[in-house]
Amino acid sequence: MKMSIRIPPRLLELAGRSLLRDQALAVSTLEELPTELFPPLFMEAFSRRRCEALKLMVQAWPFRRLPLRPLIKMPCLEAFQAVLDGLDALLTQGVRPRRWKLQVLDLQDVCENFWMVWSEAMAHGCFLNAKRNKKPVQDCPRMRGRQPLTVFVELWLKNRTLDEYLTCLLLWVKQRRDLLHLCCKKLKILGMPFRNIRSILKMVNLDCIQEVEVNCKWILPILTQFTPYLGHLRNLQKLVLSHMDVSRYVSPEQKKEIVTQFTTQFLKLRCLQKLYMNSVSFLEGHLDQLLSCLKTSLKVLTITNCVLLESDLKHLSQCPSISQLKTLDLSGIRLTNYSLVPLQILLEKVAATLEYLDLDDCGIIDSQVNAILPALSRCFELNTFSFCGNPICMATLENLLSHTIILKNLCLELYPAPQESYGADGTLCWSRFAQIRAELMKKVRHLRHPKRILFCTDNCPDHGDRSFYDLEADQYCC
C-alpha cells in the first residue's frame, strides 16, 4: 500500500495564517511581518474574503505594485471592494504606514507571474529567487512624481452595461479623481451605447491611451460623437476601426463633412504606428483625405474588406507615411478591373522594410500579376506572403513562384490552387489537384528549398469554405 507524504507548512506560513484569523489585527502588526509573506497571505485573504485583513494588508503593502487582475478573475467582488476601502484609508490619511510603498494598482489583463513566483517561493522557501524574478514596475511617465497612486486598467466596453468590477472601480475613481490617476493604455469598444462610452472616456486621461479598437456597427453620425475624443489621444500608437458604415440617410455633402472632421483628427496623432481598417465603407473615394493627415511613418497598414476606387490606390502609393511599412494587408479589396501599377509603385516604396504582405481575395487575375512581379521580387525582408483567393492559372502561379525564389527570408507562402484544379462547375477535382501539386513540388524543389508553401482551395465540402494543403500530396493543413 502506497502512503502519501504531506509536507508540513513552514512555521512562517502557519504564523501568517494565524494573523489572518486575528480579529484584532492592526497595521502596526503587519509592519513587522516579513516581506515574503505578504503575497501568499494576500492571495489567501483574497480567496477567503478576509476583508478586514485585506484592508490592512493594502495599507502596509511593501511593494510598489499590486497586480490585482489575476485575483479578481475569481468571483469575489466583496474582496475587491475591501482592497479599494483599504486604499481609501491610504489616500485620505495624512501619515502613512512606515513600510508602505504602493504606487501602482495594476488591473491590466496581462500575463502575470508575480503571484505564481511568490507562491512557489512559499512552498519551497526560495524567497531570494522570488525577489530576483519580480517584474519591474510599469510607470505612467505622465504622472510620475504627482499623484501618490496610479491605477492601470484595460477597458473592454463590450456590453450595454459594465461588469460589476469595472462599475465598482469607476465609481470609486470618480469620487477620488484628485487623489489618484486612472491610466488606461488599451481601450476596446465592442458594443455599448455611446452615451455610456462618453461618461467613461471623461474619467480616463486620454493622453495615456496607446491602443484603441472600435469594432462596432457604427454609422457616420455615431462616429462624429467619437471624433473629438480621437484628437486627444496624443500618444496613440495603434488604431483599429472595424464595421463603420455610411447611413443611407446621410447625403454626399454630409458624408464629406463628417469624413473631413474625422480624418483631420489624425493630424494630432503623432505617435501612430499601426492602422487597421476593416469594412470601413466611408473610405471609398476619401482615402486621400485620411492619408494626407498622417504625420508619422506607419509600421503596419491593413485596409481589408473595403471598397476602394482606383484613385484611392493611386493616393496610397503616393503617401509618404507608408515608405517604412513592415506589414501591408489589402485582403478583400477587389482589384479585378483596376490597373495594378499603383500597387507596383507601393511595393517598390516598401521593398526595403516589408515583412508581411497579404493580398488574399483581391480578385487579381492572370493579366494583372505581371505588373507586380518585379517589385515583389525586391522585397528581400518579406517573411510571409499570402495570395489566396485570386483566380490564376498554373502558368501564372509558376511565374509567381519563380519570382519569389530569391526572397531568402520567406518562411510562409500561401497561394490559390490553380484554376486547372477545378471542374467546369467550379468544384475541386481532387485527382487533378493532386497531380498539379506533384508537378509544382518537383519544379519548386528544383528551383529552391522553400520553408513552407501552402495551397488554398475554395468550397471544400469536408473542411469548410477554405482548406490549405502542403506541397506533399497527402498533407492537409487546416
From Swiss-Prot:
Belongs to the PRAME family. GO terms for molecular function: ubiquitin-like ligase-substrate adaptor activity. LRR repeats lie at residues 99-126, 181-205, 206-232, 233-268, 269-294, 295-326, 327-347, 351-378, 379-403. InterPro entries: LRR_dom_sf (IPR032675), PRAME (IPR026271), PRAME_domain (IPR050694). The keyword Iron does not apply. GO terms for cellular component: Cul2-RING ubiquitin ligase complex; cytoplasm. GO terms for biological process: negative regulation of apoptotic process; negative regulation of cell differentiation; negative regulation of DNA-templated transcription; positive regulation of cell population proliferation; proteasome-mediated ubiquitin-dependent protein catabolic process. Keywords: Leucine-rich repeat, Repeat. The gene is PRAMEF11. The lineage of its organism: Eukaryota, Metazoa, Chordata, Craniata, Vertebrata. This is PRAME family member 11. Gene3D superfamilies: Ribonuclease Inhibitor.
